[in-house]
C-alpha cells in the first residue's frame, strides 16, 4: 500500500488506442508493452516492431505523395487556411502532423499530400509568407537561368 502511488502502470488495456502503447514505450524506453484485459490479466504484448508498423500506417508513410513541412508561431497556425491553400491547388491533405521544436517553441507542421507535383503549391505557400523548412516531391517549374540557358543553346544551334 505504501508504494502504490509511487508506481505508474507500464501496460495498456486491450481497449486502448495504439498511441497509448507508443507513449508508454517512450516513457519507459522499452520495446515490449504488456496488454491486459479489464481484470488486469495479461492477454499479450506489443513489440517495438509492431508499434513501428502501426505508426507507419497511422502516419501514411506508405502512401504515395509529396511531403511539405512548414514552420510557424503557434499563434499563426490556422488549419483551415492551410487546407484552403492546398485544396486551391487541387491537392488533398492525407495526413497532417504538428510538433513543437523545444529549442524555438515554433510549430513544425508536416503535411502529406495526395499528389507528387508540388511546385505551384510551394509557390502558393511562399506567396502567403509561410516558412517552408522541407519538401519532397516533383517540381516542374524551371528557374530563369535554366530557361535562358536553354534558349541560348537553341539559338547557337541555329
Question: Each predicted region: which residue ranges?
Answer:
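A conserved regulatory-domain signal marking ACT and ACT-like small-molecule sensing domains
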Residues: 55, 65-158
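Bateman/CBS regulatory modules and CBS-like beta-alpha motifs in cytosolic regions of diverse proteins
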Residues: 1-30, 35-38, 42-43, 62-63, ...
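A conserved hydrophobic position in a structured secondary element of the catalytic/binding core
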Residues: 13, 46-47, 113
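Short hydrophobic beta-strand motif reused across regulatory alpha/beta modules
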Residues: 43-51
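Residue-level signal for the start and early helices of compact helical domains
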Residues: 3, 9, 27, 37, ...
Amino acid at each position: 500500500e505504501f508504494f502504490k502511488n509511487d508506481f505508474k502502470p507500464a501496460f495498456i488495456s486491450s481497449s486502448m488506442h495504439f498511441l497509448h502503447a507508443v507513449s508508454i514505450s517512450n516513457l519507459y524506453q522499452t520495446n515490449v508493452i504488456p496488454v491486459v484485459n479489464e481484470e488486469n490479466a495479461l492477454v499479450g504484448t506489443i513489440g517495438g516492431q509492431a508499434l513501428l508498423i502501426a505508426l507507419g500506417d497511422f502516419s501514411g508513410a506508405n502512401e504515395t505523395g509529396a511531403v511539405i513541412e512548414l514552420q510557424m508561431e503557434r499563434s499563426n497556425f490556422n488549419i483551415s487556411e492551410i487546407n484552403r491553400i492546398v485544396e486551391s491547388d487541387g491537392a488533398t491533405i492525407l495526413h497532417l502532423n504538428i510538433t513543437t521544436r523545444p529549442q524555438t517553441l515554433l510549430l513544425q507542421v508536416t503535411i502529406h499530400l495526395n499528389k507528387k507535383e508540388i511546385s505551384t503549391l510551394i509557390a502558393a505557400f511562399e506567396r502567403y509568407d509561410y516558412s517552408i523548412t522541407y519538401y519532397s516531391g516533383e517540381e516542374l517549374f524551371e528557374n530563369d537561368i535554366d530557361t535562358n540557358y536553354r534558349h541560348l543553346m537553341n539559338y547557337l544551334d541555329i
